[in-house]
């Protein structure tokens, strides 16, 4: 990024403060979603933007606690420690530290494009499934009940079937908060609906009283940077850390890439990986948990006037300065945070995109739907759904390229084959089968013309199969000719195929 891009712009301070006012209540909510005490969300919200601002490539990307990363954190840790316990908090810090190290290493070895392993169908299905799981996990808080463990959907159904466990006060508070947050977006895109909901809820509890669940003791003070983490659990957390490092980067990568195109800015995914890695590293050492890039807060920062990475640093600094006064939020109804989470993640379910995949790409639709269902069924261990979804996407890709499209025809005594697709080890036999079928229909032909212009890629096995077919055809008395060899395949065909190209 040029030196000009890091000079202070008047809009950076305003944007940073604006995002911080939204981030503070969101961080509390996402901390509870991740299974850590609410105050730990503020530690992550303060430290992550400060670290990311030092290395980030995007001038807008708002780093901090996010819904998806928080849910992945809960899925990774809830099976090995009791949520909100001291052991759980330390494990969350170690998990963030490992995510940070992995992202920094990937950035240094220039593995930024690895974010594209999360294909669009997988991301579509995963984010939609995660949104359903997140909404289900917040239903007990909305009705003022206590949820059991296990699958959030089953827990939510259990709560809904037991109205006797509800707290009547929580429901209208949650509904009012949801309407204010969602309605605020319609009034103006910069309206801080979640902040307004928090302020009004605090005023309500102070003036009228509230008997439902509140945040309670949050604790105050600044985070302490330390490497006193449970290193004995390192091996156990490597796999989930890798999943979060990859999946959690796919979202900020798509956000940063989109805005770089809209604003004609250069964006470096490798540098962004390092920035996101540094954010997780500092969050982990400072008592936080894994963090990522937020689409809603990034859009808010850009619309509020952010022009450089200083806006992110401002956000972190504002949250840091607020930490000594965080006790003012202790009477905040938990139902308000639940409503905020539900409204925030509701946009992740993109039904029109599912419909488009169904209409135009049934195989990709199947991958998206399978990933969605797996995410819902396997919750809270949604990282497994991600892994299976990626494998399904790879299998779908291989299946699609397994079959070459091979138009074939006869012109006089010459047979013509025009393979289209990728000629590689799995699809090569299809070319030989097509020639055999055409030869069986026209046994009197004596010429073969292979039109290769439709091939996208040719690997060694494909080139060897091509040479074998040509040798067999010549041995059978055919005159063989290659035409329209694509530029990307000329080198390997010239080396492998005994023909001048």
Identify the residue ranges that each predicted region occupies:
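Transmembrane helical cores of multi-pass ion-transport proteins
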Residues: 1-396, 400-405
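Short acidic-hydrophobic, aromatic-tinged amphipathic segments that line or gate anion-handling sites
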Residues: 499-501
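The feature marks cytosolic C-terminal regulatory regions of anion transporters and related permeases
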Residues: 347-496
